[in-house]
Amino acid sequence: AKAGADIMLVPSAFSPVTGASHWETLLRARAIETRCFVLVAAQTGTHTARAGKARKTYGHSLAVSPWSAVLADAGTERGVTLVDIDTEDVSKARKRIPALTHDRPFGDP
């Protein structure tokens, strides 16, 4: 976001337990912090992992606006989700709350 990105693309494979508890909250927080659109492709379903043990994933690919509104939630079924975005929304959000301009490194000033 500091380098000028308007969209963050995030691949993911959360488990059903951690996904249900944290998924949407974490992604909405990333949108708030960066004032970017956050577009997340998430694995869904059951997958064969090492040693033949099944691994389940949460799904719920999301599109989140720079103001943290969930624009689309793909649920747990496989498929494609389309969403219209306007990158002007990024500029508007960053003007309303210019959080990135106050970011400072830790340590000696």
Predicted regions and their residues:
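Generic alpha-helical secondary structure signal
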Residues: 21, 25, 88-91, 100
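Cysteine/selenocysteine-centered motifs that mediate thiol-based redox chemistry or coordinate metal-sulfur cofactors
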Residues: 2, 91-109
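CN hydrolase (nitrilase-like) catalytic-core segments centered on the catalytic cysteine
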Residues: 1-81
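A short, polar/charged loop-to-alpha-helix boundary motif
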Residues: 78-95
